[in-house]
Swiss-Prot record:
The keyword Nucleus does not apply. The modification Phosphoserine is found at residue 256. It is a multi-pass membrane protein. It comes from the Eukaryota. This is Sugar transporter ERD6.
Length: 496
């Protein structure tokens, strides 16, 4: 234990001091063991402050990874746009459609249970391919469904793929991106989900639901093809002891003219330190040294879902209809605004920081939920009926857009940043399961609560959003501008 503490403190001092050091060319030659060569023969020394350039390979790899997020968004947006058509064609009751809508999150829960282990065994790339098998099969089942059973089976399979995606995509991006753009690149996960949701919100108003499933298949096939052209995560390769492949992958990501030896050595040192005791089992996760990051990860996912985000997104059409606002117009307006707002958040996440965006997002979600509570409360008592459609539109729009700007993507960024490699499987699985478990509870009960007491439901969501602000302010650290190794060293140091 003393040896491990010493190594952690040493790594912390090394990580923090590197920020202030600038290695001149002479020192770069000495540290890398290179002899003097002509400028054309020498690779550029990479300062280990993470400020390396963002190469085309990093852009391409991130884009391909978040194409899976786009597939996720298509699956999430499908239930809102297809609700009227499916209910009419297959004569589904409210309970049957609630099961169909929510079973995606149940599948996500099943996928989340195995997500960490699958990603650890197969690797990040092959895990994404594995996900697409479930997604493609699921879309085909929904497209050919003649009754509720086939609908539910297809939606469940799609959910399993989406559940594994939700873990492996942010982890993969966090492991390949330089630290000064890591937040923005991981947030692209949420951006592309919003693009998928927006697309289905818009076209779901105009095309039959079976044709909509075919549209959902197209990005899945595209994603499978593109995955063959990106490198594997260097940190996963290093964890398996495949150092040569790790350096090759890192070289491809950082550029062929960059000396990656210092970054590769830092990755190796950190993995050696964190895995000194071997792979951590789920039963061993609940130790004092892991308590702080575990509370952060699980807490954020718990609060994310109890703010009502999944229910509002899945059943936006029902909310508009209940408030007397045209659902086709409402969902189209949401779709138009969601993507630009998420793009803005993608830019701001590495400028404003995680904490600021999270608290701003929760504040806006809380106010939007409060407005919806007032709107449906007025409606139930017959007060100012002419304002109900306006309040409903503003409330639903504000809730979904503010979620997209922060609380939607940032918990996944933080999850990918705070856990060391030796607990990333068990901790990441637990955090992802928490998200999907409470997501399923919210989406399944949402329609029933909406019919029972819509005003009271949104009042609860508003109070949870307020509680989230307190949680973030006191417990969630700022991880902007730090490498994964620095974050892990600082979190370890904070509990000693």
């Amino acid at each position: 234990m003393e040896r491990q503490k010493s190594m952690e403190k040493g790594l912390l001092r090394k990580s923090l001091s590197i920020r202030e050091r600038k290695f001149p060319n002479e020192d770069a030659f000495l540290e890398s063991g290179l002899s003097r060569k002509s400028p054309r023969e020498v690779k550029k020394p990479q300062n280990d402050d993470g400020e390396c350039r963002v190469t085309a390979s990093v852009f391409l790899s991130t884009f391909v990874a978040v194409s899976g997020s786009f597939c996720t968004g298509c699956g999430v947006g499908f239930s809102s746009g297809a609700q009227a058509g499916i209910t009419k064609d297959l004569s589904l009751s409210v309970a049957e459609y609630s099961m169909f809508g929510s079973i995606l999150t149940l599948g996500g829960l099943i996928g989340a249970v195995f997500s960490g282990k699958v990603a650890d065994v197969l690797g990040r790339k092959r895990t994404m391919l594995f996900c697409e098998f479930f997604c493609i099969t699921g879309w085909l089942c929904v497209a050919l469904a003649q009754n509720a059973m086939w609908l539910d089976c297809g939606r469940l399979l799609l959910g399993i793929g989406v559940g594994i995606f939700s873990y492996v995509i942010p982890v993969y991006i966090a492991e390949i991106a330089p630290k000064h753009v890591r937040g923005s690149f991981v947030f692209a996960n949420q951006l592309m989900q919003n693009c998928g949701i927006s697309l289905f919100f818009i076209i779901g108003n105009f095309i039959p639901w079976r044709l909509l499933t075919v549209v959902g298949l197209v990005p899945c096939v595209f994603h499978v093809f593109c995955l063959f052209f990106i490198p594997e995560s260097p940190r996963w390769l290093a964890k398996l002891g495949r150092d040569k492949e790790c350096r090759s992958s890192l070289q491809r990501l950082r550029g062929s003219d960059v000396d990656i030896s210092r970054e590769a050595n830092t990755i190796r040192d950190t993995i050696d330190m964190t895995e000194n005791g071997g792979e951590t089992k789920m039963s061993e996760l609940f130790q004092r040294r892991y308590a702080y990051p575990l509370i952060i990860g699980v807490g954020l996912m718990f609060l994310q879902q109890l703010c009502g985000s999944s229910g509002v997104t899945y059943y936006a059409s029902s909310l508009f209809n209940k408030g007397g606002f045209p659902s086709a117009i409402g969902t189209s307006v949401i779709a138009t605004i969601m993507v630009p707002k998420a793009m803005l958040a993608t830019v701001l996440v590495d400028k404003m920081g995680r904490r600021t965006l999270l608290m701003a997002s929760c504040s806006a979600m809380g106010l939007s939920a409060l407005l919806l509570s007032v709107s449906y409360g007025f409606q139930s008592f017959g007060i100012l009926p002419e304002l109900t459609p306006i309040f409903t539109c503003i409330g639903v729009l504000g809730h979904i857009v503010s979620f997209a700007m922060g609380m939607g993507g940032l918990p996944w960024i933080i999850m990918a940043e705070i856990f060391p490699m030796n607990v990333k499987v068990s901790a990441g699985t637990l955090v992802t399961v928490t998200n999907w478990l409470f997501g399923w509870i919210i989406t399944y009960t949402f329609n029933f609560m909406l019919e029972w007491n819509a005003s009271g439901m949104f009042l609860i969501f508003s109070m949870v959003s307020a509680s989230s602000i307190v949680f973030i302010y006191f417990l969630v650290p700022e991880t902007k501008g730090r490498s994964l190794e620095e974050i892990q060293a600082l979190l370890n140091n904070s509990v000693q």
